[in-house]
Every structure is written in structure tokens, then in C-alpha cells.
């Protein structure tokens, strides 16, 4: 593996870990609200969350580039320029992977039901206690699935990160873009090495999710 590829690998892991952490922090309250609310316009929020699933990555990346660019709304408000930077990659990755984190969490909170929370309320548990000691433990499979899917999806990003970050070695060049560069230069050996590594890693992560969820169902029974 070339030093540039190793740098891209480290950058990709850093991006995936940070994006997944941020997604879990902001996605948990959103998923909890979506699972509990009776607001009749909830479907609009759910549609916004799911939008990255159907939008072409280049479309999402284009509008994020405008938002984060030198003449974008963020810069005009004094937020600076985040395009073609690692911070911009994190911002774009969080938006692009949001449905892969929020939807499993929402499903897990809904599957837990209201009954355990009502029982905890009769024992005088505060809303915070009910959330952290009842809802979150019951939704553990959803958290595992959300974390793994968010992480794996971020690792495999191409269109969005290319649009927002370009292809700057050591700064915004992630593994998927490095693979593309190797294919363009007909360096199939390096492309095989990186692609195979991502393939194996993705399979291991998904297998771990299914194994963990199966174990949780067995323990629940």
C-alpha cells in the first residue's frame, strides 16, 4: 500500500468515526421524537430525513457545495468556507448518512413500545430516567444497526465527498476517491487491494450487525 493510500485510509476512518458519532448524538433525539410524536405533519420530517436515500449524490453534493462555498449562505453569515476541507466532508457525510442512522433508531424506539415507559413512570422515574434506563437499553439493537450502517455508508461515499471536498491528497482524498484515481491511471493492483479491503470490511460489519441482533432476539425470548 502506498503512503498516499495509507493516508486516505486513515482519513476515511477518521471521517467515518467522527460522522457516526455526530449522527448518533443528533439522530437519537430526532428518532425519539419521530417515534413518539402524534404530529400530523410528521411525514414531512420523515421525508426530509429520507431524502438522501433517493437523491443522486451529485445533486446533494452540488447543493452542499453551494451552501458551504465562499459565496454560500454559510459564508455570508460569517461561518467561513467549509468547501474543500475535512470539516466540510464531515458536514456532508452527516447529511448524506442521516437516514441510515435515524431510521433504525426510530424503528427500535417504536418496537420497544410505550408499556415499559408507562411502568417506569408508575415507579416515579423521571422522563430522563425513563429515556436512559428504559428506552435506550431496549433500543440497543437499533443503536448497533444505526452505528454500523452510518459508519459503513460513510466509508463508501464517493459522489458527495468528491463534490464537497474535491480530491486533495492528505486533506479530502478518501478511499473511494483513491480507488477511482487508481482505476483512471490503470493501476488495477492498487485498486483491487483497496476495493477488496473495503469489501471485506463492509461484509464483516454487516455480519456483526445481524449476529448481534440475532443474539439480542434470543436473549429477549
Regions found by a protein language model. Name each.
Residues 1-7, 164-203, 207-208:
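Interhelical loop and adjacent transmembrane-helix boundary motif
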Residues 5-34, 94:
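Transmembrane alpha-helix signature in integral membrane proteins
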Residues 21, 102-105, 109, 113, ...:
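Transmembrane alpha-helices
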Residues 33-64, 117, 141:
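Cytoplasmic-entry segments and transmembrane alpha-helices of multi-pass inner-membrane transporters
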Residues 37-45, 73, 85, 115, ...:
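Membrane-helix interface segments
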Residues 41, 106-125, 133, 192-221:
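C-terminal transmembrane helix and the adjacent membrane-cytosol boundary/short C-terminal tail
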Residues 61-94, 164-168:
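Membrane-interfacial helix termini and adjacent extracytoplasmic/periplasmic loops
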Residues 82-121, 134, 146-147, 207:
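Membrane-cytosol interface at the C-terminal ends of specific transmembrane alpha-helices
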